[in-house]
Design a protein with these regions (language model features):
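Peripheral docking tails and interdomain loops at the edges
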Residues: 2-4, 11, 342-383
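A charged, amphipathic alpha-helical module
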Residues: 2-38, 145, 149, 153-279
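Metallocofactor- and cofactor-centric catalytic cores in central/energy metabolism, strongly enriched
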Residues: 20-28, 33, 41-45, 49-50, ...
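Redox- and metal-dependent alpha/beta enzyme cores, enriched for Fe-S-associated oxidoreductases
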Residues: 44-63, 245-317
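Short, charged, surface-exposed secondary-structure boundary motifs
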Residues: 68-77, 136-141, 274-281, 366-368
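Glycine-rich, highly charged phosphate/nucleotide-binding loops
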Residues: 76-93, 303-316
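Acidic/His-rich segments in extracytoplasmic proteins that coordinate ligands and/or metal ions
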Residues: 86-157
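C-terminal hydrophobic structural anchor segments
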Residues: 307-351, 356
C-alpha cells in the first residue's frame, strides 16, 4: 500500500511539473492505475462494455474537458459540440496516449468526424467504428448483432486470442452487478431531501466509466454499508425536485451549479447519468444477440428518433422520483438534441411537467449566464 501511495504522489508531482513547464493542461490526469488491464477508450453508451472487458481490456470512457477548445478548430469545423472539440484537444496533445485503442460509434455526424480526425492525426494501435442502427426492430437487432460480431472479431484479431462465451458471460454478470449497485444508490434519492446529491451521482458514474468494475463494485458495496445510512424524510424541505435531461454532461460541477440555484436533481435522463445504468441483459445461448437486444432496446437517446418513448420514460421517472419539472439542456451544435426540443417540451407539458430549456457551450465559464433563468425556474416550481 505504501508503495502504491508513493507512486500515486510521484505521478501527481510529475503531472503538476509538466503543466507548469509546458502550460499543457490536457495531460493524462485520469490515468491513475486502477487495474493491470490495458485501457480501451469508448465514447457512446451504445458501446458493448462487456465485449471489451471479455477481450481483456478495461473500458475507459473518453470525456474531453470543460474548458474552451484550444487546438480543435484547426482539425475540425468550429460548428461542432464541446464534447467532440474538447476530446480532440486532449487527444492531439497526448492526453489519451495510454489507451490501447478507441471504439467509436456513428452516433452523430460530429462523432463520425471525430473518428476521422483521430484516425488520421492520433497514433493509436486499435481503432474501430461501430455502426449502430437507428431503428428498434427485428432487422435492427440482426444488424447490431452483426456489428457486435465484427467488433468481437476485430478484438480477437488484435489480441490474437479468442473471446470465449464464458468470458462474455462473466463480464455480463459483472457489469449487471454494477448496474444493480448503482440503482441501490439511486434509490437514496427517493427520500426528501435526497440522501445523495446529483453532483455525487455524476461523480460516482464518472468513477465507474474509468474504473475496473471489480474495484468499483467493491467500493460501492462498502459505501452502501457504511456511508449511506437510512434516514427519515426531513420536515419542511421545500427544494423542488427535478429531472435533468439532454446532451451528455461529464462535469459534476454543472449539476452542483443547478443544485446551488435551489433545486434537487434526483434523476438524470442522460447517457452520463442515471439513464446509462437503465439497461438489463437477458442472457441466452446467443450472447451476442443478448447484448445486441439489450443495447438496441435500452432507453433511447435523441439519436434513435424515439421521442415519444423518451418522453414516456421521463414522465415515468418523474412519478417515481416525485419531481415537479425538467431542465432540458443541450450543447450548442448538438443537432440531435436541439431538433427534439419543441416536440419533447410539448409532450412533457401535456403531462403537467414544467420544462426549462437551456443551451450552453459546454464550458464551466458559461454557467453564470444561466443562473438567473435557473433560479427563476426554481421559484416557479416552488409556487
Amino acid at each position: 500500500m505504501k508503495t502504491f501511495l508513493k507512486k500515486l504522489y510521484l505521478t501527481k508531482i510529475v503531472i503538476l511539473l509538466y503543466i507548469l513547464i509546458t502550460g499543457n493542461y490536457y495531460t493524462e490526469l485520469d490515468f491513475i492505475i486502477t487495474s493491470e488491464k490495458p485501457k480501451m477508450g469508448w465514447l457512446c453508451s451504445y458501446t458493448p462494455l462487456e465485449l471489451i472487458y471479455a477481450a481483456g481490456f478495461l473500458p475507459y470512457r473518453i470525456d474531453g474537458h470543460s474548458n474552451p477548445a484550444r487546438v480543435a478548430d484547426s482539425y475540425i469545423h468550429p460548428n461542432f459540440c464541446q464534447v467532440v472539440k474538447s476530446t480532440i484537444d486532449v487527444a492531439i496533445e497526448g492526453g489519451y496516449n495510454s489507451l490501447e485503442g478507441v471504439i467509436f460509434v456513428n452516433s452523430c455526424d460530429a462523432m463520425r468526424r471525430l473518428h476521422d480526425v483521430w484516425k488520421r492525426y492520433v497514433p493509436t494501435k486499435f481503432i474501430h467504428l461501430l455502426d449502430i442502427p437507428m431503428g428498434q426492430s427485428s432487422l435492427g437487432l440482426k444488424y447490431i448483432r452483426k456489428e457486435f460480431e465484427k467488433l468481437k472479431i476485430a478484438l480477437e484479431k488484435y489480441t490474437s486470442h479468442a473471446i470465449q462465451d464464458d468470458s462474455i458471460e462473466e463480464a455480463i454478470d459483472l457489469f449487471m452487478e454494477s448496474r444493480t449497485l448503482f440503482h441501490k444508490i439511486n434509490f437514496l434519492r427517493l427520500k426528501n431531501p435526497p440522501q445523495i446529491t446529483g453532483k455525487e451521482i455524476i461523480e460516482i458514474s464518472s468513477d465507474f466509466f474509468k474504473s475496473d468494475p471489480l474495484l468499483w463494485n467493491a467500493n460501492i458495496k462498502t459505501r452502501l454499508e457504511n456511508e449511506w445510512k437510512d434516514t427519515p424524510d426531513a420536515i419542511g424541505n421545500t427544494k423542488p425536485r427535478i429531472i435533468l435531461s439532454g446532451s451528455p454532461i461529464h462535469d459534476a460541477e454543472f449539476i452542483s451549479f443547478i443544485e446551488e440555484c435551489g433545486l434537487d436533481v434526483v434523476y438524470e435522463d442522460l447517457c452520463t447519468g442515471s439513464k446509462f445504468f437503465d439497461l438489463n441483459i437477458n442472457k441466452s445461448k446467443d450472447l451476442l444477440n443478448a447484448l445486441g437486444e439489450a443495447y438496441l432496446y435500452r432507453i433511447p437517446c435523441a439519436r434513435m428518433m424515439k421521442i415519444e418513448e423518451r418522453a414516456k420514460h421521463i414522465v415515468e421517472m418523474s412519478k417515481k422520483f416525485n419531481t415537479k419539472g425538467v431542465i432540458h439542456q443541450s450543447l450548442k451544435f448538438c443537432d440531435v438534441y436541439l431538433y427534439d426540443v419543441p416536440r419533447l417540451k410539448e409532450l412533457l407539458v401535456e403531462k403537467d411537467l414544467s420544462v426549462l430549456f437551456i443551451e450552453s457551450d459546454g464550458t464551466l465559464g458559461s454557467l453564470n449566464q444561466m443562473k438567473t433563468r435557473i433560479e427563476a425556474f426554481s421559484e416557479i416550481l416552488r409556487n
